[in-house]
Amino acid sequence: MSSEVTPKVPERPSRRKTSELFPLSGSESGDIEANSEPPTPAGTPNVPTRRPILKAKTMTSFESGMDQESLPKVPLQRPVRRSTTEELNNVMNNTSKELEEIESLISKHNIHNVSRKKSPTSVEEGKVAAIHQNGQRSASDNKTSTNPSPLEKNEHEGAEGNEFAISPSNLVNKSNNEVTEHSDSEDLTEKQKVHAALDNEAGDRSHFEEKLIPGDMKVQVDVSKDVEEGSLNALPPSGITESDDKAEKFTKHPESSLEELQKHQEQQEEKIFQNPTDEESTTSLNEKQEGKDNMEVNSQPQGPSDTETVIAATSSNVPSQIASEEENDVPVIPRSRPKKDFEAHVQKEELPNTQEKRVSEECDSTLISTEEESKIPKIPSERPKRRAPPPVPKKPSSRIAAFQEMLQKQQQQDLHNNGNSSATTASADIAKKHTDSSITSDTTKADFTSKLNGLFALPGMVNPGQLPPSLEKKLSSPDTESKLGPQDQSQAKTGPLGGTRRGRGPRGRKLPSKVASVEKIEEDDNTNKIEIFNNWNVSSSFSKEKVLIDTTPGEQAERALDEKSKSIPEEQREQSPNKMEAALCPFELDEKEKLPANAESDPLSQLPQTNTVGNRKAISEESLSPSEAIANRDQNDTTEIQEQQMEDQMEVDMERELSGGYEDVDSALHSEEASFHSL
C-alpha cells in the first residue's frame, strides 16, 4: 500500500493543568515542572481562586456609593401659604385699562393748572395752615412717603411760567425732587402709576367724596374762591400786579368753569358706578395722598418769597384742615365770610337721592341673582343614605299584658262605680246619711282594698287576687255577711289555695309507649296491713331406737362406767331448777316416769335420757314465744356440759391406749369405734 492510503493518527490531546489551591511539597512540584507543558498565553483572564467576600449592604455603604447630587434636597423652611388677597390683586390688574382712561380724563380737566394769586400779606395764612398741617402729620405717622406726585410738579411748573422767578434754593429742591421722581418712576409698575394718579385726584376731594359721591371738584373751587377773595380785600390798592388780573378774571367768570365741572362729574359718576371696584380702590388710597401733600408743604421752605407754595397748600388742603379741627378741636376763624352758592347746594341735595336709587337698584339685582341661584337645583355629589327603619317595639310578656288588661278593667269599673255612687248620694236623705255612716265607712274600706288588688303584700296573703279570710271578715260589711248562706261560706273556705298549673313539656306530642304503659303508684296513708311469719325452726331426727341398735354391749358397759364417774355433777345438776322441764309434752312425762325403774337395772339407759332431753328442748323451744326462747337460751348450759364430757372421754381413751389395758383386740376395736361415734 502506498503512503497516501495509510491514515494519519492524530496526536493525543494534552490536558491543561490549573494551579493548585494549596502549595505542594518539593518533590511533587519538581515532577510537575518537569512534565509541565508550555504556559497558557497571557491574554486569557485569570480565574480567581476564591470568591470575593460581599460587603454588608448597610446604610453607610449605600450613602457612600451614591452621589450627593442625586438625593433630593429638603427645604429648610415650610412653603408659605398663598394669601387670600391674591384674587383682589388679579381683579385690579384686569381693570388697568379703565383706570388709564380715568387718568386721561383727570389730566384734561385738572384744576391745579389754574394760576393762584401771590401776595405778601398771604404769608400769614400759609403759616396758620402749616401749623394745622403739622398737627395733622402727627396723627398720620405711618405715612412716610415724601415724594411729590407728578400732577403737583406740573402745577408748580405752570405757576413758575406765569408768576415771579423762584429763588435758587427752590430750584435745588426741585432738581432733587425730579431726580428722585425719575428713579421712583422706573421702579413703579403700571398698576402703581395708575394708583398714584388716582391718589392725586383723591387728595383734593372733600368730605363729601369720602361718602362715595364723586364730583367734588366744585367744592374745591368754592373754597379757593373764598380764600382768594379774602386775600384781595387784604391787599393795598396800590400794589396790583398781573397775578391780581388773573385772579379777577377767574372770579369774574365762575359760571363757565362750573358748567365744565358739572359735565366732568357726570361722566365720572357713570364710569365709577359701572366699575365700583375702581371707586373702592380710589377711596382706600385717599388718606395716603393727603399725607403726601402734607409732607410736600412742610418740606418746602417757608419765606416771603415762597408765597405761591403756601397759597397752593391752603387751597388744596382745606379738607385736611377740617379734619385736623375735628381731631384737635381747635376752631379756625376765616377772615372773610363765605358766600352761599345756591346751585351747589341744590346739586348736593340731588346727588344723594340719585346715589340711593342706584345703590337700591344694585341691592335688588344682587338679591334677584341670589334668589335665582337658590332656585336652581343642585345635584349632590354623594347619594344620600337611606334611613334605617324604626326599631320594632318588643311585645310585652304574657304576665305584663294580663296585668295591664286587669288595670284597665279596674279603672273602668271604678269610673262606673263613682258615677253611680255620686247619683245615689245626691238622691239620699240627710237622716239616712247619719245612720249609715258606719256602714259606708266599712264599704269604702272594702273598696279601697279591692282597688289594691294585691299590689301590696299583706300578712297571710297567698294568692295576689284574693285576700285572707280573716281580713275579709274585718273589711266586709255585716249586710254582705248576712246575705251569704252557710253553704256559700263553706265553699269559699274550701276553695283552692292556688291555681293548678300545667306541667311544662312538649305540646302536641305523644309520650313513648314505654313511659305511657308504666302504672302509677298510689300511696294510701290510711290503710295498715299486718303480716306474721316464722323467723327460725328447730328439728331433731335422733331417735331412741336407733341408739340402742347401733351400740354393742361392750360399748354400753364402757359408757356406764363413764357416767358413774360423772354421776356427782349430774345429781347436782338435777337438783338445780330447770324451767324447760315444765314445758314438756305429756307423752314425754309418761316416758320419764317409766325410765327411773329401768335405769337402776341398766346403767346404759342414761344415754337415751340425754337424747330425750335434747328432744324436749327442741319441742319446748317450738312451743315457746321468741322472747321466752331467748331468755331460756341464756340460762341453758347444756352445750358447755357436752363439750366438757367429750374432752374427758378423749383423755380416758388416750390413757388406755398408752397403758395397753385392753385384754383383747376386739375390745380395743370396739373402744375406737365408740370414741369415733362419740365425736
Curated annotation (Swiss-Prot):
Entry-annotated residues carrying Phosphothreonine: 18, 58, 85, 277, 552
Q: Any idea which UniProt keywords this protein has?
A: Cytoplasm, Cytoskeleton, Phosphoprotein
Stretches for region Disordered: 1-85, 111-522, 549-580, 593-679
Keyword Phosphoprotein in the entry? The reply is yes
Write out the annotated subcellular location.
Cytoplasm, Cytoskeleton, Actin patch
For this record, an example GO cellular component is:
actin cortical patch
Question: Which superkingdom heads the taxonomic lineage of this protein's source?
Answer: Eukaryota
Purpose of the protein = Involved in mitochondrial migration along actin filaments.
Protein name as annotated:
Altered inheritance of mitochondria protein 21
Name the species this protein comes from. Answer: Saccharomyces cerevisiae (strain JAY291) (Baker's yeast)
